[in-house]
């Protein structure tokens, strides 16, 4: 009787597998001819006006504007605040031959995934369904080899000499407008206790020289004797302490690891009477909790101070937020909808791909491995203008690209929140 039941169960399983394979095959045939392709020229032709972060509106564009700006989009100076880019020259290809630089960050079945990708010409996509993929292997860079993607085709290249000579000022000030900063983050776990408390190093990639050098910007490490996540950021990689001369910021979380605040090096308002010495809040990051246990991409909201526009006598500066009471903090102001002089950003929602059964984002060749840590930051009024993007390229290497209005400290602090485990978000 037991053998009969086993045979019946096995036959049932085989029949279900066959039905699932036929269904997937039919779905592939239906959608193979209409897979979205990423055409750089077409994307650039649709660009008109681009967002600015002045003190009045979130972005100075009309509601009907067509906006499409990627992290690899050139910005050409005109009379507009952010101008229409020049088209890149690309080899002529048929639409189905242009590969999408998509990174998968959601759930999927592992079986026959390579076959699924090849059916729709997405063989360079990588997929994942776990929080910690450190031990897994992934595909190579998904960027189409016919496109030159290792140079920043933006309007203005970073002033590398200024950055080297004025490191502390550069990391704290808002980024220069029309300039993209391509950075990398290295996670170092070596040492007795660095498996639990790794050190993170942020470097700016230098592209206007033949040597492709990297400029050290910041280092970060989680404090050992803290009950919640508490990361110290410093421009001195040899002294990651509050007493060090390079100490410039810290990132603090709540108990669940779902809400984070990025502070500058100022003092706690409870420990000083000097208002000018009180710490500023540079950003707050809120991860949406997942109380029902549904797995999927993380949802982030970033609250940050607004930017005072530049004048003849000074560049653009950040509006100071120095809360003395809890109700004046960025997190509380966001909860109470008190958003005057604040900017609200969020992560770009990935798109579900039926063929790979996963969520995907286009990182334009800067991210090569799947992870729920990967994200792109946008303003909802201009979802194609990527303010920041972060993602994995190897077990302990990540890329972090950012633009105005973020500073290096703000961007690095936001990246630190992605490294920290979130009990209620998985």
Curated annotation (Swiss-Prot):
Changing residue 252 to A: Abolishes localization to the periciliary membrane compartment in AWB sensory neurons. Pfam families: Tub (PF01167). GO terms for biological process: chemotaxis; lipid metabolic process; positive regulation of neurogenesis; protein localization to cilium; protein localization to non-motile cilium; receptor localization to non-motile cilium. SUPFAM superfamilies: Tubby C-terminal domain-like. It comes from the Eukaryota. Disruption phenotype: Twofold increase in fat content. Extension in life span. Defective in chemotaxis. Reduces AWA cilia complexity and branching from the AWA periciliary membrane compartments (PCMC). AWB cilia are severely truncated due to elongation failure during postembryonic stages and AWC membraneous ciliary fans are significantly decreased. Increase in localization of PtdIns(4,5)P2 and PPK-1 to the cilia base in AWB neurons. Reduces lengths of ASH and ASI neuronal cilia. Mislocalization of GPCR proteins to the (PCMC) in AWB sensory neurons, such as srbc-64, tax-4 and arl-13. Residues 19-39 are annotated as: Disordered. GO terms for cellular component: axon; cilium; cytoplasm; dendrite; non-motile cilium; periciliary membrane compartment. Keywords: Cell projection, Chemotaxis, Cytoplasm, Lipid metabolism, Sensory transduction. Expressed in ciliated sensory neurons. It is found in: Cytoplasm; Cell projection, Axon; Cell projection, Dendrite; Cell projection, Cilium. Its main location: cytoplasm. Residues 16-28 are annotated as: Required for localization to cilia in AWB sensory neurons. Belongs to the TUB family. Has a role in fat regulation independent of daf-16. Implicated in ciliar sensory function which is required for normal sensory behavior such as chemotaxis. Required for extension and growth of sensory neuronal cilia during postembryonic development, potentially via mediating signaling protein transport and localization of PI(4,5)P2 to the ciliary base. Functions in life span control via the insulin/IGF-1 pathway. Thought to be involved in neuronal trafficking. Interacts with rgb-3. PANTHER family: PROTEIN KING TUBBY, TUBBY-RELATED. This is Tubby protein homolog 1. It comes from Caenorhabditis elegans. The gene is tub-1.
